[in-house]
Amino acid sequence: MKRVILFLITNLAVMLVLSATLRILGLDRFITAEGLNLNALLMFSLVVGFTGSFISLLISKPMAKYSTGAQVIDPNAPRSQREAWLLDTVYQLADRAGIGRPEVAIYEGAPNAFATGAFKNDALVAVSTGLLESMREEEVAAVLGHEVAHIANGDMVTLTLIQGVVNTFVVFLARVVGYFVDRTIFRTERGVGPGYYVTVIVCEIVFGVLASIIVAWFSRQREYRADAGAAQLLGAREPMIHALARLGGLEPGDLPKSFQASGIAGGGAISALFSSHPPIPARIAALQQMRLS
């Protein structure tokens, strides 16, 4: 699938701006004279949490094009045989998957590819020049099948919903902890003091890191599905296995983190817990064990 710094940065930026805006407008009235209004806080957290993730989803295509410098191929006037082949291959895969034909783009970079877009029938599949130059056609077709499977499986929307849920918990818990720290440690009796805001910021960072582990785990499960989807679309497991094996011997290109989850290669995460992609040997083993329908 591809899905976690551009998506997360955009998501976090929207959350922060929205939080500040709601406070300026006086719409964050979950702290009252009687204490913390948990129902009001939950509603506030839902608005902030889901708005950030959905705005990130809606602008994912233009942000992907901008951040990678991807050039969309004109379907009516491909400039080379390679571009014509890419269009034809992606369109065939999309037709088999039962989705609208996505935009197809090429960007300069080391081996990688990604898919993004808010809707199945209005998506983008992009592949790097490094991948095109280092893989055989059947392997490139498998990678394209993997990306089309991400779109068909609705992985960007799934990631957005998961991100919205974890955002909500991060916003909610950070403010609950901030309130109690401000009351019990800093002894604030009326309203909230500096301790509340400092605690909220620290908790949002800490809880955000923990939440990213959950998002990464879901992303890894969707990667297995996309690998299997590529095999189903191609009618054989071998092209996807060969593509992964070749990718394992290459230095995959970094993507903006927001698109790593929908890329073919991992994002080079420090720990497996934070990786959006399973290890390549595990992905190959899963493909070898699957049954084609």
UniProtKB/Swiss-Prot annotation:
Keywords, comma-separated and alphabetical: Cell inner membrane, Cell membrane, Hydrolase, Membrane, Metal-binding, Metalloprotease, Protease, Transmembrane, Transmembrane helix, Zinc
Disulfide topology: none
EC number, as in UniProt: 3.4.24.-
Transmembrane portions of the chain: 4-24, 40-60, 161-181, 198-218
Keyword DNA-binding in record: no
Cofactor note: Binds 1 zinc ion per subunit.
Signal peptide positions (record): none
Protein's UniProt keywords contain Cell membrane: yes
Active site annotation, chain numbering: 147
Membrane-protein topology: Multi-pass membrane protein
Cofactor field: Zn(2+)
GO biological process annotation, one example: proteolysis
A GO term for molecular function: zinc ion binding
Subcellular location: Cell inner membrane
Protein family membership: Belongs to the peptidase M48B family.
Protein name: Protease HtpX homolog
Lineage: Bacteria, Pseudomonadati, Pseudomonadota, Betaproteobacteria, Burkholderiales
